[in-house]
Amino acid sequence: MAVITLASDVTLTDYIQPVCLPHTNTQDRGPLAITGWGNTRAGGGRPQPADILQLLYVNEVPLPFCNDDWKAKVDDDLLPSHICVTGVKLGRSSCKGDSGGPLVRNFDVSSDEVWQLAGVVSFGTNNCGNVDLPLGFVRIDGEVNFWLRNIIGNNLPDYPSDS
């Protein structure tokens, strides 16, 4: 994670919106989505970056199943800090150029406007759009408070309460 200090204020628009950071005790519930500007050409061939921001709704895969799938390809176990997902649409996934991009979760299904950052793109297959292996993301919920308090500073307010 990084904090970027901007020279001027950002004007929020339909295309520029903040994302909420999760609580450390976030429950894994609510729809997930990924966005990115990465390669839109599935399979091989010359990469073609997106002309417009791409959106894909995804489903979470339980970590033990994801670990079993990836264990056949790599000789490392996934960590509890990983989240695995599969695309809802066959042949669609994150791809080269999407690394570090957001995985967001909608915690308020009554509103399409309350999204929290759940993770960042970490790994996938070389064959974009491959549905045989889940996509891998790094969770951020366990790191957010530590990072905010120890890297940014100790004078941040606590999360607002629900009351």
What are these regions (language model features)?
Residues 9, 84, 101-102, 134:
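Proline-centered helix-kink/hinge sites
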Residues 11, 41-43, 67, 92-93, ...:
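Eukaryotic short linear interaction motifs
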Residues 93, 99-102:
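Beta-propeller and closely related beta-sheet repeat lectin domains
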